[in-house]
Amino acid sequence: MSGIKYTKTHEWIIVTDETNWIATMGIAERVQLIHGDIVFIEMAVIGDEFEAEEIIGQINVVSGETIPIHIPVTGEVIEINELIEENVDVINHSPEGDGWILKIAFESSVEFESLMDQDDYNMYEEDSDLDPEYLDDDEYDE
């Protein structure tokens, strides 16, 4: 397992500790390109457990929209990024770096490997052609 992976709902995940099955996740820069800066984030707490694709939180963007955050793999939240709790603007400047959202302990490499790699995600983005409807609320229905 290596490299960053992406979901169709624009979350990213990377395995940061293969021995203990720990991954770091966040939202893709794509979300900001379409919706603008993030002004508020609400997320799960340490110890919460989720199935893959469940909603673990939400972001509010400058336009007033609320966008759900989905967990890419089944797992337990083990760490929250304190930087974004103190200053959500960190996500705006580095959504796929210092603006990571949380770390999860997970068990299924199958779920991880089934996600899109960088090339597949880039093709997925190109197919959407930066269409604002591309991230409408219907895409996030459970």
Q: Model segments located where?
A:
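Acidic, low-complexity mobile loops and tails
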Residues: 1-52, 93-120, 124-142
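Conserved hydrophobic positions within beta-strands
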Residues: 10-13, 59, 69, 77
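Nucleotide phosphate-binding site architecture
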Residues: 57, 78, 122
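Mid-chain, well-packed structural core segment of small domains
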Residues: 63-98
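Short, charged beta-turn/beta-strand-edge "cap" motif at the junction between a beta-strand
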Residues: 55-57, 62-64, 84, 108
